[in-house]
Structures are given as structure tokens and as C-alpha cells.
């Protein structure tokens, strides 16, 4: 009797964990937040005095510990929840018109 109860509880826990993982996976796919990383086309290097060469524009130098070279990357976080849902009329008004 105890073995059957223990086996039933194990199965119930496995099912609960599976449902939780499925829900977490679908929730992660529906997040309306976007983090983008773009390569700026240049690299950065550590100078003999310990400082790093500058990156162009809004790019920053990212490097591994102990390495003397890195990549110039631009990072941006966009939260799409701050934008309202547009109506059809607003979409039509924002559509470019041919000349």
C-alpha cells in the first residue's frame, strides 16, 4: 500500500513539474520585452596603462576577464508594453503613402 501511494505521489509531482515547465516556456515566448545586441564593426584593446580604447558612438567595450582584446557592442532594451495597441485608423494614418 505504501509503495503504491509513494509511486502515485511521484507521478503527481512529475506531472506538476511538467505543467509548470510548459507554462514557463510559453510565458517566456510571449514576453513583450526585447534585448538587442549589435556588433559595431570594431574591436577594443587594453592599453599598457590599463585603460581600454574607446568604441564609436553609443557602443561599449565588452571583454572577458584576463583578455586584452574585446568587442565594441551596442546594447538596447525595448519594452513594448509601454506602447498602446494601435487601432486600424492609426495604422492607416502611419502608413507611408506613395508620391
UniProtKB/Swiss-Prot annotation:
Keywords: Disulfide bond, Glycoprotein, Secreted, Signal. GO terms for cellular component: extracellular region. Disulfide bonds join 40-59, 44-61, 55-72. The keyword Aminoacyl-tRNA synthetase does not apply. Glycans are attached at residues 43, 49, 58, 85. Residues 1-28 form the signal peptide. GO terms for molecular function: C-X-C chemokine binding. Its main location: secreted. It is found in: Secreted. Salivary chemokine-binding protein which binds to host chemokines CXCL1, CXCL2, CXCL3, CXCL5 and CXCL8. This is Evasin P1162. It comes from Ixodes ricinus.
